[in-house]
């Protein structure tokens, strides 16, 4: 069975007798899978909140190192301001621009499920936590002048305008993608953390990594429930998303050189992506599934 909306985009139905303008104003109605997963979302949200270790962006930004830019009478960024190794700043910029594109991922989750009740609470929480990462990364990097803020802003605008769309994914594909996507970013951050000497930045990247691990757990547990509800479709969904998952930053057109630098530094590359996918499939207990064995074997 395929869990997509009948008339609406992804997760809800709309009365066919309504005009187009009126239909767009109607409150969406959750479909079967959205309702099936709602108790699991509630359970996972409670666990997520009960186990949180709250942290704040301002605690990880050395504001005493900051100074005004030329617009306010100071001086603009210069390459000599950078003190971190290139592979570290490249990885940080990849991570930051990825986080800047959060709106697209939020939209796809809302369109595939529903921004109501416990689903709405989870999507709001996940979005807030992901946005925190963008806030703190940009604050740290701009205050410490480790990146060219003007060039970074140009890439941010370009990438956000390019956007992210997954409207061809089924609901289960969306969950499978999110679980593997979060795992990839967690591994990216852990490997980056291991190569940072500056203690504040090291702790910051570790915080982000922990959030990514917790997000992976949430989405992965929803997929685990889908395996009990519609196993065949879920296995197929995992296979489709595993086959197309890309390296972290691979979709940032302006940063392909940085993606190569990060790969050469051993932070994240195609080999590590394959390990991410294999480990996630194994964690779901699916390593012996015929359609997934291609992702397990080296």
Label for each model-derived stretch:
Residues 2, 13, 20-22:
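Short, positively charged and aromatic/hydrophobic N-terminal segments
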């Amino acid at each position: 069975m395929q869990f997509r909306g009948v008339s609406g985009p992804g997760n809800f139905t709309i009365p066919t007798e309504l005009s187009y303008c009126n239909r767009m104003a109607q409150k969406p109605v959750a479909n079967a899978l959205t309702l099936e997963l709602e108790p699991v979302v509630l359970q996972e949200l409670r666990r997520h909140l009960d186990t949180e270790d709250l942290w704040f962006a301002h605690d990880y930004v050395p504001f005493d190192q900051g100074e005004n830019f030329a617009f306010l009478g100071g001086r603009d960024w210069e390459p000599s301001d950078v003190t971190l190794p290139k592979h570290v700043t490249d990885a940080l910029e990849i991570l930051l621009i990825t986080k800047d594109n959060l709106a697209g991922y939020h939209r796809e989750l809302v369109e595939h499920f529903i921004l109501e009740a416990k689903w709405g609470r989870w999507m709001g929480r996940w979005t807030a936590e992901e946005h925190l990462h963008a806030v703190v990364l940009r604050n740290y990097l701009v205050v410490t002048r480790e990146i060219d803020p003007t060039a970074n802003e140009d890439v941010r605008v370009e990438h956000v305008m390019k956007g992210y769309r997954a409207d061809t994914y089924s609901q289960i594909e969306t969950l499978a993608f999110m679980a593997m996507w979060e795992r990839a970013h967690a591994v990216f951050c852990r490997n980056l953390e291991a190569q940072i000497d500056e203690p504040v930045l090291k702790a910051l990247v570790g915080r982000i990594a922990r959030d990514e691990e917790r997000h992976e757990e949430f989405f992965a547990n929803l997929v685990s429930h889908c395996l009990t509800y519609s196993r065949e479709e879920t296995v197929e969904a995992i296979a489709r998303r595993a086959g197309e998952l890309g390296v972290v930053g691979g979709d940032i057109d302006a940063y392909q050189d940085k993606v190569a630098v990060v790969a050469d530094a051993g932070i994240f590359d195609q080999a590590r992506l394959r390990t991410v996918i294999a480990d996630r499939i194994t964690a779901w207990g699916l390593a012996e599934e015929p359609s997934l064995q291609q992702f397990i074997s080296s």
